[in-house]
Amino acid sequence: MTDPGYAARIKELLRHVQVASRQDLELLKYGRHFRLPGGAKAVVGRTERENEAIETLISSGDFLLQVDQYPGPLVLVGGAVSGEDLEVAAGLAAAYSDAPQGTPVTVTAEPGGSDRVFRLTTPTKDRFKPWLV
């Protein structure tokens, strides 16, 4: 645990859960982590390898978001996920995708079978800095 980023992620996680699951700890190894306004946790893959790893760590009740028209990250959202948190996570998926800023995109959120679709304009990454862990 010599990586200061990993240590900070563990501290942040333990402020929000009483007991960390194996999945919680495994997810700390991958992606960019955001604590969303409603308290849900979002993990944004940085590479294809991280996207693949994140996809294997989905639990019941989690959402997996992805931009439909452009390459980009998978965004895993877990915890008590509000509608607002899902909208913010859709913005994360768009901002970190290859879609040019200001481009209209569609983001699909998959919670184990029933999809939710968000249509938005690609925001800047700076919009999400307040929630970066």
Would you name each region that the model predicts?
Residues 1-76, 82-83, 96-100:
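Nucleotide-activated chemistry modules centered on ATP-dependent adenylation/adenylyltransferase
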Residues 26, 33, 60, 68-73, ...:
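RNA-binding accessory domains that recognize and position tRNA/RNA substrates
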